[in-house]
């Protein structure tokens, strides 16, 4: 199911007929800002527009592996407090790795995907909404095909590296934090006449670096999408020093 179909499912597009009465929501991978707000939004749309029963799966796919399945029945009371303003995910999450090769306590690895599929059916779910990054989406796509499950994926990654997605949940917060870090480094760099280096997350994607670097006034921004050399960086900093600029980021 595509994100366009998700919008239709949750009432943002054309009304469609369907038989879904019970859905689950889980968060997978690393935590980030915006997760609780996303879960809340899904719940209110599913409940208010379609009268669905909504279950929150605890600790990502690990919750579906547990017996009994670890879940929270979501209701209006769940979201009545300050949950919306809290970081992280109140459902819990996991980044233990691939459930097709799940690490066991004895050091071995085991395919536990059938347990996830069985947990889905044990709860009587008509569909599952997964909020996760590229790794989670890749894994859940395989599980959906294996078990013939109805799964919708919502992109969540501070790296913003999910294809065909302009911006993912968590990215904006990550850029704001990195920009604030650069702002804080400016005064120290100026006081000591030094070059300060800020390393940010992103793996093979430079979205955080380029956006925070521009917003925070970085003098040199290195991203994996573009080749660079140490000599090129040194030449740039030397040029700045020759112009009387004695500190840099």
Report the location of each language-model feature:
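A cross-family phosphate/adenosyl-ligand binding-site feature
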Residues: 16-28, 38-124, 135
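Short, glycine-rich nucleotide/cofactor-binding loops
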Residues: 26-35, 201
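A glycine- and small-aliphatic-rich helix-loop capping segment at beta-alpha/alpha-beta transitions
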Residues: 40-48, 70-77, 142-152, 169-173, ...
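Short gly/pro/ser/thr-enriched loop/turn and capping motifs at secondary-structure boundaries
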Residues: 62-64, 98-99, 137, 157-162, ...
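Accessory alpha-helical/coil subdomains and C-terminal extensions
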Residues: 119-121, 127-132, 138-142, 147, ...
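Acidic/polar active-site rim loop that often engages polyanionic ligands
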Residues: 154-167, 190-191, 215-216
């Amino acid at each position: 199911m595509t994100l366009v179909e998700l919008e239709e499912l949750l009432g943002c597009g054309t009304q469609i007929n369907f038989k879904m009465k019970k859905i689950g929501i889980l968060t997978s991978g690393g935590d980030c800002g915006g997760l609780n707000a996303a879960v809340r939004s899904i719940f209110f749309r599913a409940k208010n527009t379609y009268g669905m029963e909504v279950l929150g799966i605890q600790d990502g796919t690990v919750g579906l592996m547990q017996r009994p399945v670890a879940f929270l029945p979501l209701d209006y009371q769940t979201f009545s407090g300050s949950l919306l303003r809290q970081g992280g995910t109140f459902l819990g999450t996991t980044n233990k790795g691939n459930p097709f090769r799940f690490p066991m306590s004895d050091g071995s690895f085991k395919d536990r995907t059938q347990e996830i599929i069985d947990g889905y059916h044990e709860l009587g779910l008509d569909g599952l909404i997964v909020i996760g990054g590229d790794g989670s989406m890749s894994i859940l796509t395989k599980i959906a095909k294996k078990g013939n499950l109805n799964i919708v994926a919502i992109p969540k990654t501070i790296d913003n590296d999910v294809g065909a997605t302009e911006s993912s949940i968590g990215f904006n917060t990550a850029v704001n934090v990195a920009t604030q870090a650069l702002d804080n480094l400016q005064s120290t760099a100026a006081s000591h006449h030094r070059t300060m280096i800020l390393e940010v997350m992103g793996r093979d994607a430079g979205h955080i670096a380029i956006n925070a670097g521009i917003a925070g006034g970085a003098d040199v921004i290195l991203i994996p999408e573009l080749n660079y050399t140490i000599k090129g960086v040194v030449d740039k900093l030397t040029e700045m020093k020759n112009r009387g600029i004695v500190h840099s980021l």
